């Protein structure tokens, strides 16, 4: 199963094998220098991203129902359609639960979220036959924007290993570290700039909103994100700004 949240628009920059040091770019740019989106525009783009994530399994459910309507006497086709509907419904539910926590309000402005819930929704969309999720974050209540940041970084990490691999999530001091390891890991083009709030040509659309939103979460929480290319993988390191 491929990464359900992969954005296919930007091409990727593959890391050089002989690079002695990881390249890093931080998100602590001054607020006056950061690209600003109007509230309605931000909401519209995030909503577009959520719809993009959910439309595939919902469409598969519709296809399964059509197969049932057209082949209700064929037992093999009926079994195929029911299996497709069942699998797609579970997938749609998992993606909606993830999006609710990663993009939604999750309670009042000062709400805290159980990191155990974050692990559950992350496993629902990323832990499959191609990608293994190793979650090493102690279960506790965490400010919701930190949890949202963590979940969005897990998605970004998944996008760096399109062929699958291992994603490790662990706490480090006041922050956390998300590492993706797999075959030919790569950092999608422009992701550092989007995390920093500096989109190319001052343009953001539904395919680019997720990394931009991730950087916005980091700045709101008083954190910085460092993206580093390492031997065999890519890491996202979060610390106090």
Short names for language-model regions:
Residues 35-45, 130-156, 162, 199-206:
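Conserved short strand/loop->alpha-helix "switch" segment adjacent to the catalytic nucleotide/phosphoryl-transfer site
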Residues 69-81:
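Conserved catalytic segment of histidine kinase HATPase_c domains, centered on the N-box/ATP-lid region
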Residues 222-229:
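Glycine-rich ATP-binding loops of the HATPase_c
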């Amino acid at each position: 199963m491929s990464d359900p949240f992969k954005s296919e628009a930007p091409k990727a920059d593959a890391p050089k094998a002989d690079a002695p040091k990881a390249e890093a770019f931080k998100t602590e740019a001054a607020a006056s220098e950061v690209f600003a989106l109007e509230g309605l525009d931000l909401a519209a783009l995030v909503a577009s991203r959520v719809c993009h994530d959910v439309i595939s399994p919902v469409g598969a459910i519709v296809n399964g129902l059509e197969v049932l309507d057209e082949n209700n006497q064929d037992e093999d086709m009926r079994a195929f359609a029911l299996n497709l509907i069942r699998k797609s419904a579970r997938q749609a539910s998992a993606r909606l639960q993830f999006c609710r926590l990663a993009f939604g309000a999750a309670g009042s402005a000062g709400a805290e979220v159980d990191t155990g819930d974050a692990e559950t929704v992350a496993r629902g969309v990323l832990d499959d036959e191609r990608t293994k999720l190793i979650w090493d974050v102690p279960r506790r209540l965490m400010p919701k924007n930190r949890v949202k940041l963590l979940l969005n970084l897990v998605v970004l990490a998944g996008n760096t290993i399109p062929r699958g691999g291992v994603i490790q999530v662990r706490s480090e001091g006041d922050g956390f570290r998300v590492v993706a390891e797999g075959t030919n890991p790569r950092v999608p083009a422009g992701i550092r700039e989007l995390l920093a709030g500096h989109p190319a040509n001052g343009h953001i659309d539904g395919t680019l909103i997720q990394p931009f939103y991730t950087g916005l979460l980091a700045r709101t929480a008083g954190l910085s994100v460092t993206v580093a290319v390492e031997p065999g993988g890519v890491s996202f390191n979060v610390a106090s700004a």
